[in-house]
Structures are given as C-alpha cells and as structure tokens.
Regions:
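Bacterial N-terminal signal peptides that target proteins for export
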Residues: 1-10
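C-terminal motif of bacterial Sec signal peptides marking the signal peptidase cleavage site
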Residues: 17-20
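Noncatalytic scaffold domains of N-terminal-nucleophile
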Residues: 22-52, 56, 64-65, 69-187
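Repetitive helical segments and hydrophobic/amphipathic motifs
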Residues: 13-14
Length: 187
C-alpha cells in the first residue's frame, strides 16, 4: 500500500512540475487518451508515449523513481513543451520510510557574478535575463535524475534511457499541438 501511495505522489509531483513548465499559450491536445484502471500503480502524465514508458518500467519491476526518470527522458522527446533535459526541476521522494528532496534546478554558470545583469550605473539591463547567452543557466535535469537514480533507483540506468532513445530513433506520431508549435516556431 505504501508503494502505491509513493508512486502516485511521485508521479503526480512530476506531472505538476512538468505542467508548470508548459507553455500557457499552447493549444490543448485534441483528445485525452482513455483512463486505464490498475490495482498496482497510478500514472498521471499528459503524454501517452511517456505514460506507456512509465507502465513498461513498472512492469519490468522498476520502482516509482525509475518510472519517473524514464518518463522524464521520454517527455524530452515526445512532449517538449513540458519535458526536456535542458532545464531543471525538483523531485520529492518517499521510499522505504525515507524522504528526500532532490533539487536539480538550473544553476548559474561558473563565471556568473551578482552584477552581470547591471549596466555601468547599476541599473538592470532590460531583457538580459530573458534573451541571449546570459539568460541561460546550466541544466540540472540529467544530473538530478542521476542523483535520484543512484540513491533510490532499482533498474539499470541504461534501461531508463532506452525508451526515450527508441522514441527518438524510431519516431512517433506527434500530438497536433506539437506539430503546430514546430510549424509556428521553425517555419
């Protein structure tokens, strides 16, 4: 029972973090996939490919952390509005009576300093934190997933990456919202 609650909370938390990163102006998906009932686990993910990945990881005997990591990598391929490896996030884990919080948010580059966004008068330079190289941070997602896996994962790391690699290599049918986003952004 405890594992079911942990899995539900972890994946719901991952979904909430991912949903918070989504573009507010993106159109909603055309239709939601049908709900699937289970007595063993629950997965709430806004992408059917990533949901299938989570289900497969659990079926192979992986735990909630394994499923969350594999899902995160899959969403980096199939649901780029919310999932990517170029950002960061947080993971709250409760497993075997132990609670942990993994902070893998983006970090400032090594050469960053507290005045890097100020002009010679000490005023904030408009849009410098939004546009250009100085607006970027050092991504933390992969390092955070790795840290969570090392402490709480049960399957080999390679098995968690394989579904995302397969999706990227073999392709997938993108959601209409992703097609529109790519066309509007890159055409």
């Amino acid at each position: 029972m405890m594992m079911k609650k942990t899995l539900s909370l972890l994946l719901a938390g991952l979904f909430c973090i991912a949903a918070g990163c989504a573009d507010d102006n993106a159109p909603p998906p055309a239709a939601s996939p049908p709900a699937i009932a289970s007595r063993q686990a629950a997965v709430a993910i806004p992408d059917p490919y990533a949901a299938d990945v989570a289900e497969e990881i659990l079926r192979r005997g992986g735990n909630a952390v394994d499923a969350a990591i594999a899902t995160g990598f899959a969403m980096a391929v199939t649901y780029i509005d919310a999932g990517n490896i170029g950002g960061g996030g947080f993971m709250l884990i409760h497993q075997d009576g132990e609670s942990a919080f993994v902070d893998y948010r983006e970090r400032a580059p090594f050469a960053a300093d507290r005045d890097m966004y100020l002009d010679e008068n000490g005023d904030v330079i408009e849009n410098i934190t939004l546009i250009g190289a100085q607006a970027a941070g050092v991504p933390g997602t992969v390092a955070g997933f790795w840290a969570a896996h090392q402490r709480f994962g049960s399957l080999p790391w390679r098995e968690l990456l394989e579904p995302a690699i397969t999706l990227a290599r073999d392709g997938f049918l993108p959601a209409p919202a992703l097609v529109t986003f790519i066309q509007d952004t890159y055409d």
